[in-house]
């Protein structure tokens, strides 16, 4: 058998150590160009002028941005509204609808459909649409029989 050369392993080990000690590339704080117009030109001729108004974003972490990245306090959570009071507000505003909605003679886009008490009402149309949509699931679960 051939004797292994330890110099190769030492060189490999030194390369790994030097590679791990090298400095990582850091992004510079500045402007990021998102979109710019590039002029049509030959490859050997430099562009006449660069785009005068590229779409850019300023990536400098200003004090305003850094202030927004702090943890939320209890006061911040106390100011959040869950929207639970919206339903009361909606029912208060809709109690006095001007007119009796149950006595409509005919609904639009329905031939011969009455507003209340008929089989062609909106609720029956929605119900049948939902049932047709759920039919494949009922077949899979065996509930359609």
Swiss-Prot record:
Keywords: Chaperone, Periplasm, Signal. One of its GO terms (cellular component) is periplasmic space. Residues 1-27 form the signal peptide. Disruption phenotype: Deletion of just fapA in the overexpressing strain alters the fibril composition; fibrils are shorter, more stable and are composed mainly of FapB with minor amounts of FapC. Deletion of the entire fapA-fapF six-gene locus shows no visible growth phenotype. An intrinsically disordered chaperone for fibril amyloid FapC that guards against fibrillation, pro within the periplasm. Upon overexpression of the endogenous six-gene locus (fapA-fapF), cells form large clumps during liquid growth, make large amounts of biofilm and produce relatively unstable amyloid fibrils. Belongs to the FapA family. Monomer in solution. Interacts with FapC but not FapB in vitro. This is Functional amyloid chaperone FapA. It comes from Pseudomonas putida (strain ATCC 700007 / DSM 6899 / JCM 31910 / BCRC 17059 / LMG 24140 / F1). The gene is fapA.
């Amino acid at each position: 058998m051939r004797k292994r050369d330890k110099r190769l392993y030492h060189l490999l080990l030194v390369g790994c150590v030097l590679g791990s000690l090298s400095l990582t590339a850091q992004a510079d704080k500045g402007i990021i160009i998102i979109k710019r117009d590039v002029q049509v030109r030959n490859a050997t001729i430099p562009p006449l002028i660069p785009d005068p108004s590229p779409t850019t974003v300023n990536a400098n972490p200003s004090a305003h941005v850094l202030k927004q990245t702090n943890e939320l306090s209890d006061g911040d959570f106390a100011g959040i509204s869950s929207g639970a009071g919206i339903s009361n507000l909606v029912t208060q505003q809709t109690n006095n609808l001007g007119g009796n909605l149950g006595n409509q003679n005919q609904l639009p886009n329905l031939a011969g459909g009455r507003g209340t008490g008929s089989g062609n009402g909106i609720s029956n149309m929605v119900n049948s649409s939902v049932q047709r949509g759920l039919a494949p699931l009922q077949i899979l679960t065996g509930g359609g029989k």
